[in-house]
Amino acid sequence: MKKLLWVALACALFALPSHAQTTPAADASVGYSYLRVTGSNGVNLNGVSGSVSYNANDWFGLVGDLGVYHGSPFGIGFTATTYTFGPRFSYRKDSRVTPFAQALFGGFHFSASSGGFGASSNPFAFSFGGGADVPLGSNDRIGLRPQFDYIGFRSNGSTSNSVRISVALVFHIGQR
C-alpha cells in the first residue's frame, strides 16, 4: 500500500510540470470560410481555409494560411484563392481560451468564367485579423477556432477590401 502511495505521489509531481506547459509547438486548422469580395456589386464566396503555424514561444508564432472559395452570382463562376504568410501574436494567460491577432502578406488569385470565356488576376494581398482557439471539452489538443479577417488586395493601382469569416477545427501539435 505504501508503494502505491509513493507511485501515486510521484505521478502527481511529474504531471505538474507537464500541465504547466500549455503552449503547443505547432497548430494546424481546417474549416469553413465565407469571403465577401467587395467591389461595385460585391461577391459572396464560400469555401475552405486552413493554416499551419509554428509557435516560437507562448506569444509569437509564424503562420501560413491558404483559402479556396467559390461562388456563382449573376451566372458567373468566381473562384478565389488566398495564400498568405506572417506573424501571429497569441495571449495564453489565465484562461483555456487563446485569443490571437495576425498580420499576413502574400497573394490573391481571382478567376471568373462564363459561357466558355474567362479572366483571372493574381494581385498582392494582405490580411489583418484575429480570432480565438477554444478547446473542445477537456481535450486541449483539439479546439474550435472562430476567426475574422480583413483582406485587401492591390490590383491596377487600387485596393479592394474584403472580409473573411471562418470557423475551423484546430489541432495543437506537440508542446513548447
Give the positions of each predicted feature.
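Cleavable N-terminal export/targeting peptides
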Residues: 1-23, 174-176
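Outer-membrane beta-barrel domain signature
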Residues: 19-21, 37-43, 73-78, 114-121, ...
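Enrichment for repetitive, rod-forming helical segments
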Residues: 9-13, 95, 148, 152-154, ...
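Short glycine/proline-enriched turn or capping motifs at secondary-structure junctions
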Residues: 6, 156-167, 173-176
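Extended interaction regions within the primary functional domain
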Residues: 10, 32, 163
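Gram-negative (and chloroplast) outer-membrane scaffold detector with strong preference
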Residues: 51-146, 150, 166
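Short loop/turn motifs that connect adjacent beta-strands in outer-membrane beta-barrel proteins
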Residues: 20-25, 39-42, 59, 92-98, ...
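Short glycine/proline- and aromatic-enriched beta-strand/turn motifs that initiate or cap beta-hairpins
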Residues: 19-56, 62, 66-70, 105, ...
